[in-house]
A protein has these predicted regions:
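Short phosphate-binding loop-to-helix
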Residues: 56, 62-109, 117-125
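N-terminal nucleotide-binding beta1-loop-alpha1 segment
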Residues: 9-26
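Short, high-confidence coil segments that cap the C-terminus of an alpha-helix
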Residues: 52, 105, 136-139
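Conserved core of the sugar-phosphate nucleotidyltransferase
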Residues: 88-89, 94-95, 116-208
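A short, N-terminal amphipathic alpha-helix
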Residues: 38-54, 66
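Short, Lys/Arg-enriched N-terminal segments with co-localized hydrophobic residues
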Residues: 1-8
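Hydrophobic targeting segments
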Residues: 11-16, 39, 55-57
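Short beta-strand/turn micro-motifs composed of small residues
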Residues: 18, 59, 145
Length: 212
């Protein structure tokens, strides 16, 4: 009897896009935050996780990274961002695509430098959840969310998810999930199908509010 082929995913690459300019907060990635540059907080968390084999920094700020003591190593790859995908209006999916095309990996974990409170424990648990989902064919990607149960209104003050005349406890309201951009976990295959970090069959992972 022919046994099914088991694919063992081993190489995990973390994608950490970083640019020199920010339209809202000038130079935010390099501003000091509690004793070190903002980008170092999530970078150091990723570096502390042995399951992550490679951290890929897609950037237009190589010289600034060097000034702040960050150099390439066997676990850190600094990629110069092509001019055509530089700028504030460029979709993040285009930047991710540039990395996926050029850096082979079994699993990609994408996060942002603006997640300094994201914990090592959350990253590891999300990764384990994704690996379990893949093994059981439950999902092809994962993204993090905030779980919300509260009363929403539209811009005209019209109730969206509740009846103001019948105020039930908020814990009994329909649960809504807010994408929080903490983490996206996916494969090359799932990315190719949607050309996006969220695949065709994603799973949601609720993160602690203090981290998101």
């Amino acid at each position: 009897m022919k046994l099914p082929i088991t694919i063992i995913m081993t190489k995990v690459a973390a994608l950490l896009p970083l640019k020199a300019h920010s339209s809202r907060v000038q130079g935010k990635n390099f501003k000091e935050f509690c004793g070190k540059p903002l980008f170092r907080w999530v970078f150091d968390k990723l570096l502390s996780i042995s399951e992550i084999e490679l951290i890929v920094i897609n950037t237009d700020a190589r010289s600034l990274l060097l000034q702040h003591g960050l150099e390439e190593s066997d676990r850190v790859m600094i990629r110069d961002r092509p001019r055509e995908i530089c700028g504030d209006e460029i979709s993040m999916n285009k930047i991710i695509n540039d990395d996926v095309k050029n850096v082979p990996a079994d699993i990609y974990i994408m996060t942002h430098t603006t997640n300094p409170l994201l914990s090592k424990n959350t990253i590891l648990n999300a990764l384990k959840t994704f690996q379990k989902n893949i093994k059981e064919n439950k999902a092809d990607s994962l993204f993090t969310v905030n779980k919300i149960q509260t009363r929403f209104y539209d811009k005209n003050g019209k109730a969206i998810n509740h009846d103001p005349k019948n105020l039930i406890p908020t814990q009994n309201l329909e649960t809504w999930y807010e994408e929080n951009s903490n983490l996206y976990i996916f494969t090359e295959d799932s990315f190719k199908k949607t050309k996006a970090r969220i695949g065709q069959e994603p799973s949601m992972y609720v993160t602690p509010l203090v981290e998101s």
